[in-house]
């Protein structure tokens, strides 16, 4: 698999991770603009786009995350096109999460106090033609500058890509996850328990259109859709289940 590491000059966490990735001899493609404001014309063709990025939240909680970019609604204020999602590789996302958790639990990194989690689809870029993922250090400027956090991300990237390149990973079902909060606690837990390879994730509050649902089932390889039954409103559950049944899409409660 051909892949491209992408770093933004506007992003301190991105620059931090870039430094560590380059220290291991890997090339990094650098852009002047924010990664979330980029689009497919900014990059050479690749089979996988990996954005080295910061994560920001009001809580400022130390967090390491991985997710695929995309806009689930008409709101594209954070980059990308309205109601468009980039392709997703659930094996990459899940192995990356597991490897970040592995390194984060090592004795030399435990005192950093980071959480590890997925995030749902949000922000750009959305028009990429190959799978993409953001790997992020959060959630404030203090964490963005931590070398050990960048080292966790870098080691996790190397392990993940080596596993994929050498097909050194177990065969498991691949799923799309619907429901829950922004950090997808249900699906993060399932991935860390190594039950599935989990790709696209959407939150409880999203009102998914048929356009988005069709993109999700066409832009990711999957075996079934996992529905966080307690993590959705009743009317949305009925709507999504009806769509999946009408289109012969396998789904399960999780």
From Swiss-Prot:
Top-rank taxon, per record: Archaea
The entry's keywords: Hydrolase, Metal-binding, Zinc
Signal sequence annotation: none
Organism per entry: Methanococcus maripaludis (strain C5 / ATCC BAA-1333)
Free-text function comment from the UniProt entry: D-aminoacyl-tRNA deacylase with broad substrate specificity. By recycling D-aminoacyl-tRNA to D-amino acids and free tRNA molecules, this enzyme counteracts the toxicity associated with the formation of D-aminoacyl-tRNA entities in vivo.
Gene3D superfamilies listed in its UniProt record: AF0625-like (3.40.630.50)
EC number: 3.1.1.96
Reactions that this protein is recorded to catalyse: a D-aminoacyl-tRNA + H2O = a tRNA + a D-alpha-amino acid + H(+); glycyl-tRNA(Ala) + H2O = tRNA(Ala) + glycine + H(+)
Alphabetical list of Pfam families matching this protein: tRNA_deacylase (PF04414)
Cofactor note (record): Binds 2 Zn(2+) ions per subunit.
SUPFAM superfamilies assigned to the protein according to its UniProt record, in alphabetical order: AF0625-like (SSF142535)
Family membership: Belongs to the DtdA deacylase family.
PANTHER family: D-AMINOACYL-TRNA DEACYLASE (PTHR34667:SF1)
Renumbered residue ranges of the record's region Disordered: 61-85
Complexes and interactors: Monomer.
Ranges of biased composition (kind: Polar residues): 65-84
Name assigned to this protein: D-aminoacyl-tRNA deacylase
GO biological process terms held by the UniProt record: D-amino acid catabolic process
InterPro entries the record matches: Deacylase_DtdA_archaea (IPR018033), DtdA (IPR007508)
Cofactors demanded by this protein: Zn(2+)
GO MF term set: D-aminoacyl-tRNA deacylase activity; zinc ion binding
């Amino acid at each position: 698999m051909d892949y491209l590491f992408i770093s933004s000059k506007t992003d301190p966490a991105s620059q931090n991770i870039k430094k560590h990735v380059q220290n291991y001899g890997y090339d990094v493609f650098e852009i002047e603009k924010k990664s979330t404001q980029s689009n497919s014309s900014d990059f050479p063709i690749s089979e996988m786009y990996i954005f080295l990025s910061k994560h920001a939240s009001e809580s400022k909680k130390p967090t390491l995350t991985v997710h695929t970019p995309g806009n689930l609604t008409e709101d594209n204020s954070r980059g990308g096109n309205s109601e468009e999602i980039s392709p997703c590789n659930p094996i990459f996302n899940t192995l990356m999460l597991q490897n970040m958790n592995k390194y984060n639990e090592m004795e030399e990194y435990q005192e950093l106090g980071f959480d590890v989690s997925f995030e749902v689809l949000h922000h750009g870029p959305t028009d990429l033609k190959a799978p993409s993922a953001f790997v992020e250090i959060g959630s404030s400027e203090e964490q963005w500058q931590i070398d050990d956090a960048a080292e966790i991300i870098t080691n996790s990237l190397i392990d993940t890509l080596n596993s994929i390149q050498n097909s050194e990973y177990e065969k498991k079902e691949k799923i799309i996850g619907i429901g829950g909060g922004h950090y997808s606690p249900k699906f993060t837990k399932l991935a860390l328990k190594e039950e599935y390879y989990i790709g696209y994730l959407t939150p409880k509050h999203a009102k998914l259109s048929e356009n988005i649902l069709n993109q999700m089932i066409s832009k990711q390889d999957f075996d079934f859709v996992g529905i966080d039954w307690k993590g959705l409103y009743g009317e949305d559950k009925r709507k999504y289940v009806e769509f999946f049944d009408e289109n012969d899409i396998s789904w399960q409660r999780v």
